[in-house]
């Protein structure tokens, strides 16, 4: 499944803010989009609107609006968390810094690669890092899932231990977690952030392995303007 949280997490600690994460959203259809709206959070004084539509190309477009429901200015970044099944290979283009390096990743071909093995992650480990391009990809079997988003410069990322990219691994699943720009919102103001989901079958002649230049090229083609 997939959810949305406000970043940084240290502002609301744990567990996730229920109004944004697990409580029911109100939903309505507007044109070709499904629009889902949360209640205002209590521990994080924000609300979220999710606008979802399928594009002509067959991709899924997700537009998130994060609104400051507080009476004072507050700084937040949008944060999408998508859980995929155990196993698989995750990768993104390596950026300027790694913030949290708990996962055993490999750096090859200008990219950071994580091959999930549920036996080696204990109770959960995380990587947070900058990316050099606005995508985060994951291969399961021969299906490639790519999230595309605006690349966020270091100066616009949420404070450490947050970062533009996070990969969280537990024994039974992996989380793919991009974040948008960190900005101050006046009371009642909103910020909008867009993520595209692409799916593609990996051709049989492409090896699914750490460092695969062909996999990187396929992800680049899917996210090309």
Regions found by a protein language model. Give the residues of each.
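Surface-exposed acidic/polar loop and edge beta-strand patches at domain peripheries
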Residues: 1-61, 69-225
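Beta-strand-loop-alpha "switch" segments that mediate conformational coupling across diverse proteins
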Residues: 64
């Amino acid at each position: 499944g997939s959810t949305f949280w406000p970043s940084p997490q240290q502002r609301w600690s744990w567990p996730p803010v229920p109004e944004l994460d697990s409580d029911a959203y109100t939903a309505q259809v507007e044109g070709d989009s499904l629009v889902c709206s949360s209640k205002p959070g209590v521990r994080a004084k924000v609300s979220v609107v999710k606008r979802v539509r399928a594009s002509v190309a067959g991709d899924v477009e997700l537009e998130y609006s994060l609104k400051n429901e507080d009476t004072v200015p507050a700084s937040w970044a949008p944060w999408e968390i998508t859980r995929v099944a155990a196993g698989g290979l995750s990768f993104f283009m390596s950026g300027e810094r790694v913030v949290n390096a708990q996962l055993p990743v490999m750096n090859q071909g200008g990219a950071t690669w994580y091959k999930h093995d549920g036996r080696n992650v204990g109770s959960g480990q995380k990587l947070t890092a900058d990316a050099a391009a606005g995508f985060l990809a994951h291969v399961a079997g021969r299906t490639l899932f790519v999230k595309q988003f605006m690349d966020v410069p270091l100066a616009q990322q949420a404070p450490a231990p947050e970062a533009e990219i996070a990969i969280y691994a537990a024994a039974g699943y992996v989380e793919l977690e991009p974040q948008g720009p960190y900005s101050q919102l006046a009371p009642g103001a909103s910020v909008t952030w867009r993520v595209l989901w692409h799916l593609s079958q990996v051709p049989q002649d492409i090896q699914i392995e750490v460092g695969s230049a062909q996999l990187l090229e396929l992800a680049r083609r899917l996210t090309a303007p």
